[in-house]
Curated annotation (Swiss-Prot):
The lineage of its organism: Bacteria, Pseudomonadati, Aquificota, Aquificia, Aquificales. CDD domains: AdSS. Its cofactor is Mg(2+). The gene is purA. GTP binds at residues 12-18, 40-42, 302, 328-330, 410-412. Mg(2+) binds at residues 13, 40. It comes from the Bacteria. This is Adenylosuccinate synthetase. Belongs to the adenylosuccinate synthetase family. Keywords: Cytoplasm, GTP-binding, Ligase, Magnesium, Metal-binding, Nucleotide-binding, Purine biosynthesis. It comes from Aquifex aeolicus (strain VF5). It holds the Pfam family Adenylsucc_synt.
């Protein structure tokens, strides 16, 4: 069984949606295994723009099965709207959608807590209840999709959780609590009724299915709850570390997989937290406008900066990457010079590693190498012969620094705007 894992190698928003859409056509199954509706994967098909928050991107292909695995936290209301939105555009996915019965639910009270926590701490959350949903999961107070099969048990769990949240709201935040248990109960059961035929035992599913599987990571390695810029991270393992517990399959299952990292030709970040190569002046604004750097989930402007190769090599080590896709190369087309960060300076010492300590990360200063810009459009290029030498030199420098081949370049948002550079992935995925 052929397996491909696609992972974000930066702080998310690397363009994974397009790459998954492009490659998943040649797979039988696509799987989302962590995160929730805080992710936003954007795909442009026949000039139509799709933004998927919960559904695997590959499900846009009519022969591909889509899996929402147990590592995700699922907002059934969002899922309902997403499926209906696709149906209105002539894309029907219900018959090909499989949802783990072990996946936890995002409830209205999680969103309430998210907004209260954000007011208090302000880490730049999407306010979609993802963090509190994971908090309840690991605090053993979560409600799983399988719990909705027993309506009496579901009501009891809901009652207990609402009492818990009410105390937090009133006694900790001095805020009014006005969520109605019966309304939540009825809404969740109504959504469950819509999707109950899609709910499966995922362990049995993986052990009985034949065919190739593409695993679609959400967010990015530097937002991983364990390996990212903690505490300014997401609440799940957004790196390869999340694969086994997110799917329920043992590590051995992934031993023959190809691990593909997706990275922009520069760096962006949404929300708060350390960002060593951030550009706050005209150059940062230029990157933002040329790259259209506004969040697909929140609409917030993204912080922009030069490519951070120290962080990118760290992502290689965390994930065991076999190859890279570099996206948005065309955004750099008009720059006279292009800088890449090759080391950090920390308290007068030059270091070549990505620190775990928050207090160190906010103190590091980037050490740059300046490369010559290409001053020629690469937008929409579909063959390597169309690329200027300086652009290829830029790609080669990334390969030499990270030790990982760049197998593909994305040169625009459309499905056909890409260039294969290496055959290593192309032959494995059957893509031509």
């Amino acid at each position: 069984m052929e397996k491909l894992i696609i992972l974000g190698a930066q702080w998310g928003d690397e363009g994974k949606g397009k790459i998954v859409d492009l490659l998943s056509e040649h797979f039988d199954i696509t799987v989302r295994y962590q995160g929730g509706s805080n992710a936003g994967h954007t795909v442009v098909v026949n000039s139509q723009k799709f933004i998927l928050h919960l559904l695997p991107t590959g499900i846009l292909h009519e022969h591909v099965k889509g899996v929402i695995a147990q590592g995700m936290v699922v907002d059934l209301e969002v899922l309902h709207k997403e499926v209906k939105n696709l149906e209105e555009k002539g894309i029907y996915v219900k018959e090909r959608l499989f949802i783990s019965d072990r996946a936890h639910l995002v409830m209205p009270y999680h969103k309430l807590l998210d907004s209260l926590f954000e007011k208090k701490k302000g880490i730049g959350t999407t306010l979609r209840g993802i963090g509190p949903a994971y908090m309840f999961k690991y605090g053993r107070k979560g409600i799983r999709i399988s719990d909705l099969k027993d309506e009496k048990r579901f009501y009891t769990l809901l009652e207990d959780n609402l009492d818990f949240v009410k105390n937090i709201c009133e006694k900790v935040f001095c805020e009014k609590f006005d969520l109605d248990i019966n309304q939540i109960y009825e809404e969740q059961l109504r959504y469950f009724e819509e999707f109950k035929e899609n709910v499966v035992d995922l362990l049995r599913f993986f052990n009985t299915q034949k065919g190739s599987v593409l695993f679609e990571g959400a967010q990015g390695t530097l937002l991983d709850v364990d390996m990212g810029t903690y505490p300014y991270v997401t609440s799940s393992n957004a790196s390869a570390l999340g694969l086994s517990n997110g799917t329920g399959m043992p590590p051995k299952y992934f031993s023959d997989a190809f691990f593909l990292g997706v990275a922009k030709a520069y760096t962006t970040r949404v929300g708060e937290g350390p960002f060593p190569t951030e550009l706050k002046g005209e150059e940062g604004e230029k990157l933002r406008e040329l790259g259209g750097e506004y969040g697909s989930t929140t609409g917030r402007p993204r912080r922009c900066g030069w490519l951070d190769l120290v962080a990118l090599k760290y992502a290689v080590q965390v994930n065991g990457l076999d190859g890279f896709v570099i996206t948005k190369l065309d955004v750099l087309d008009t720059f006279d010079e292009v800088k890449v960060c090759v080391a950090y300076e920390l308290d007068g010492e030059v270091i070549d590693y990505f620190p775990a300590s928050y207090s160190e990360l906010i103190r590091v200063k980037p050490v740059y190498k300046t490369l010559k810009g290409w001053k020629k459009s690469t937008k929409g290029a579909k063959d390597v012969s169309e690329l200027p030498k300086e652009a290829l030199d830029y790609v080669k420098f990334i390969e030499e620094y990270t030790g990982v081949p760049v197998v593909m370049l994305s040169t625009g948002p459309k499905r056909d705007e890409y260039i294969w550079l290496k055959e290593i992935l192309r032959t494995r995925s059957g893509y031509s």
